[in-house]
Amino acid sequence: MKQVLKKTNYAQAINDEILEKLSLKNRYAWVNNNLQSILTPEQFGFFRKVQRFCLKFEKNNNITHSTDEDIYSWIPDFGAEGFISRFHKFEMIDLNYDPYGAVPDFLRNLAMDMFDPQFAMAGGATVLAINPLHEHHDNIPIRLEALKDMATGKAPGCICITEPERGSDAVHQLTTCDEQPDGSFLLNGRKIYNTNAPKSKWAVVYATAEQNNGNQMAQFLIDTSWEGWNCERVFIPWVPKVHLGHEILENLRVPKEYILGEVGKGRDHLFEGLIPERIGIAAMAIAECWGALSFAAIYANMRKQFDQMILLFQGVGFLLTELWAKTSNLTWGIFKFCEAFDEKMEKFGGQLPANLSRALVSSASQFKFHCTALTREVCYECANLMGGAGLCDNTLMHDYLNISRIQEIVGGSRQIQQYIMSMALRQLFKMI
């Protein structure tokens, strides 16, 4: 048997014919046939542009998606093509992306997630640091430099909210910021589970002038080369190629021009980022569903047992169609949300009214809640339908199975999303 895939020193478990059919090119073709009808020619053209780059990058760099590959070394190439974020135009740093917005970013995310889900997750964490800088750069040179570094892939970024003793309770932080006579601040405290932190040049950090007082929060841009920034890696076995951090801040001095949100403004800045963060996680989760479905659907059409393809057995085919229908319907929902978000942003000049923003926060939580629950189901069931082929290292299915286990936790747990939605129901009642 000719070996067509060399990922590790372990065996090739899937035969050549099926393995070749499971190529990225064919999986893209399968998804394209599903989505082409809902995309405009311009949207589909951009989607294909990202796909073509991923295919070329995989081939030219002999990417096997093995567990020992350094996904962070890929970032500069993707950044140079404008594929780190398409949520904004970035005219203030002379990028002037076209297209841009929630819809193009969703399509970028989908194409990149099918290329490598762990790489897409790491890229999403950089976007979380990009967004507050985009909103609060105030044309200050160092902030624009950091924004351009991250948007163009010159350096990864991270956002530091979670603390060892403050997970879901993000507004009662223990990390402190003490203002100095020269207008700078000294930061002291600990952060944890911050994606990309050990690899990042730039970090957006939240701290408070008074512990446990959300009204005294501030937001800072940090250069991780500064004295007082200490970071070690937290290893998450589900995503072995993604580096998360545990940061110890010891008298970390932040100059005045790096203060993105003064004391009292940090909480507002934190909440304004919830919509793009949660819809981004939802988009990533639905992308994982499509990735897993593409593997399982192709495999089920080729694998034979009892002298017929396994797709024709109701236990396989009917389950696969159920997962396909659920994924398709949620994709329509996210796509419509992204279109509406882009329309509202254009209508209101990039600043959503407070009441509309609150409504969209609850909608984003709904999608985050539903999509992350679905990816947990879809990725497991697709791997199960593929049997051993869905668990071995010959394909990306094991990556989808692993990463889907953590999406409900990332960016606010399932229970927090339910709490947010319950508060929204309370507000809707009060409006009657």
For every predicted segment, state its role.
Residues P117-P141, G167-A170, P181:
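N-terminal glycine-rich flavin-associated loop
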Residues T152-T162:
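A short, Trp-centered hydrophobic/proline-enriched beta-strand micro-motif
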Residues K2-Y28, N384-I432:
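Glycine-rich phosphate/cofactor-binding loops in nucleotide/flavin-utilizing enzymes
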Residues V31-L35, K59, I63-Y72, D94-N96, ...:
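Glycine-rich cofactor-pocket loops
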Residues M1-G123, D149, Q351, M431:
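Amphipathic, small/basic residue-rich leader segments at the start of a protein or domain
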Residues N230-T331, Q407, R426, I432:
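Glycine-rich beta->alpha junctions and the first turn(s) of the following alpha-helix
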Residues L356-A389:
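Charged, glycine-rich active-site and insertion segments that engage polyanionic ligands
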Residues S184, N188-N230:
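A short core secondary-structure module
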